[in-house]
Amino acid sequence: MPEFELYVEDRQVVTPGELLARGQVIASEGTYTSGDEVYSKVTGLVDIDGRRIRVIPLAGPYRPSPGDFVVGIVEEVKFSSWLIDVRAPLPAILHVSNALEEEVDLIETDLSRYYRPGDVITAVVREVDPVQRVELSLLEDDAPTRLGRLQGGQVVEIDPVKVPRVIGRKGSMIKMLKRVLGCDIVVGANGRIYVRAREEPKKERELLAVRAIREIERRSHLRGLTDWLKANLKRLSRW
């Protein structure tokens, strides 16, 4: 007899309580087990990778976790910190000790010389307390890209649970977007995405990138999305 049985297909939309698999599988996020059976906990897309099975929700708020890479917007400058909008229930706090390697005289220094309201930054979630207060850091060595202020470009926001589709399996979608559009694209776990064109015509490239990201969000439940989008981007691009 097989070691496990699957009752759904990869990328299939499932609902809470739906039987996904039975046997020796690894039940991951969005699932629960009863005996040797695995069920869906949410309405979402099945993701099967070998023995591992998970369900990616079709919609939901950003739930911060330590280690998350996020794109934030500075809301307020305090005496020794900044308040950052990361799309969490409460503003995140960025202490000066987690933002600057240099020592700063807080009596003499206005922190807005470093970051001011409206600035877009990349950061890593350092800590989340029981009431979902988030503490950020810009001093993490293992971040996927440089941390700190982002300049120029455009910012687009999507449902945070659609972020895995923008990235794609093994990074396939995001790599294709960067290559075809000639853009740097920074994807935050909080569903905020920064786009900046590397080549002319920059405005057109950025607008098409934003449009593409919106299409991914809208069509995230479809199979073959990467190939479909690649074909359409090549048709729509005029450079």
Swiss-Prot record:
List each copy of the KH domain by range.
Answer: 151-217
Superkingdom of the organism of origin: Archaea
Q: Does the keyword Secreted apply?
A: no
Q: Name one GO cellular component term.
A: exosome (RNase complex)
Instruction: Describe the function of this protein.
Output: Non-catalytic component of the exosome, which is a complex involved in RNA degradation. Increases the RNA binding and the efficiency of RNA degradation. Confers strong poly(A) specificity to the exosome.
Please name the PANTHER family in this protein's record: EXOSOME COMPLEX COMPONENT RRP4 (PTHR21321:SF4), PNAS-3 RELATED (PTHR21321)
Protein name as catalogued:
Exosome complex component Rrp4
Name of encoding gene? rrp4
